[in-house]
Regions:
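N-terminal accessory beta-strand-rich subdomains and adjacent acidic, glycine-rich linkers
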Residues: 1-126
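An acidic-aromatic substrate-binding cleft motif
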Residues: 123-158
Length: 158
């Protein structure tokens, strides 16, 4: 696996053709997951939900992006991760490049290329070395299906 840390306000990493892009949500109600980077971004229709589910700065962005981290699944089968090691950044796919921009000025970015689990593990390790780790005890979690509210209809439930 190739791994490096670079310091910059804006980072650009050549990836080769991007087939899929992993977008990380702004918070727990924001969309996260693998998407086609060539598909148009559709804003959340309802203004109240849009303000609560998406970063207002990027709610009407024409390009898909991830909060702090993005991963490209490339045509050659490799995965390339560009991840901020400080909050307040965004990563977007741009044809054969991952582009990151920090709202906090110059920051450290992790660039990792390898298998999917390797690049995600490298990011987790880099973040925990910077930000620390919580205890390993049981945690109570809350699961929300609110992101589906716009698509739920009486007919779909029945």
């Amino acid at each position: 696996m190739d791994l490096r840390i670079e310091r910059a306000r804006e980072s650009a990493v050549e990836t080769g053709r991007i087939e899929r892009f992993y977008r990380h949500g702004w918070h727990s109600w924001s969309p996260s997951g693998w998407v086609d980077p060539n598909e148009p971004v559709v804003p959340i229709r309802d203004e109240g939900r849009r303000l609560g589910h998406e970063d207002p700065e990027h709610a009407f962005a024409s390009r898909v992006g991830g909060s702090c981290v993005g991963v490209a699944r490339c045509a050659d089968g490799a995965y390339v991760l560009l991840g901020a090691l400080t909050p307040g950044a965004r990563v977007e796919p741009d044809e054969a490049t991952l582009r990151g921009v920090s709202e906090a000025g110059e920051i450290d970015w992790l660039v990792a290329r390898g298998a999917m689990n390797e690049v995600f593990d490298a990011y987790v390790n880099a973040l925990t070395s910077r930000l620390g780790r919580r205890g390993r005890g049981r945690m109570r979690v809350w699961c929300s299906w609110y992101s589906y509210c716009e698509d739920i209809t009486e007919e779909a439930i029945e």
